[in-house]
Amino acid sequence: MHIPQWTVTALLKLTRANRAYLDPAAARKRIAKRALLPQPIVPRFFPGKTQVRIKVTYSAGQYIYVLVPNDQQPRGAFVYVHGGGWVNQIAPQHWQLAAEMATTTGRAVLLPIYPLIPFGTAAQVIPSIGRITLAAKEKFGEVALGGDSAGGQIALSAALEIRKTATMPIVLISPALDATFSNPHIPAAQQADPWLGVPGCKVFLEEWAASTPLTDPKVSPLLAPATELASLGPVTIFTGTADIFNPDAHLLAHKIAAEGGHYDLVEEPSGLHVYPLLPTRAGAAARAQICALMRTH
């Protein structure tokens, strides 16, 4: 069952979902609240839960949940880094996407539970995601890497870190790409975005960066040299136009193309932030496209 996107937009506005992203003070309160009251990791139910087997391992300083299809040996792996503004825990929508990917592609889907701010930092997490990805490649033979929002930033930064050792297909959903927010088209995108806001994102990113400069590719993968971005495996970017991260998605595609790299930019007109995770018709189509992509790589 799909719901119209306008109902999601209305709900976001009604609940003031962007409060912590528009107001720096509210962003700091969110960090303090999450530190004191951590969110649950595994939901009691999510669509597709009964179709997969779930186990948990511990590696590179993180718990990693592994979803594999029932009664099948996995063929390859997908390391998926959840989003949440570097401050929010993995959500049921991430679990639903992971289950759908596992059952329709036959891959093992790995969900690293990385430390969030104020405890986790880019310098700590990026190398560990790289190690987890390389270990998955060694175990399963083929590996893809992806993530949404903050998780997209982490995934792309990790791919840059390990590019000289291994490359793989990369899937980015509404990725955060540049912590400096210097793209001149972002203010216009902000007017259309009912979910995110630059002021709060800057607070979260400054906490995430810690002592790492905001311009470092560990924090802002878009600012890596174009030659390095183009040397990665094929990059598929899903982005909606009602998202403050949309302008940087175009810049990423441009930088990859300028050096002859392989990319695909999938843009949803009026699409919300992380629209492939939403229970809309456009979201379902994007999830199907992601799964089809994973079957062909």
Regions found by a protein language model. Give the residues of each.
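Alpha/beta-hydrolase superfamily serine-hydrolase fold, recognizing
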Residues: 61-65, 71-297
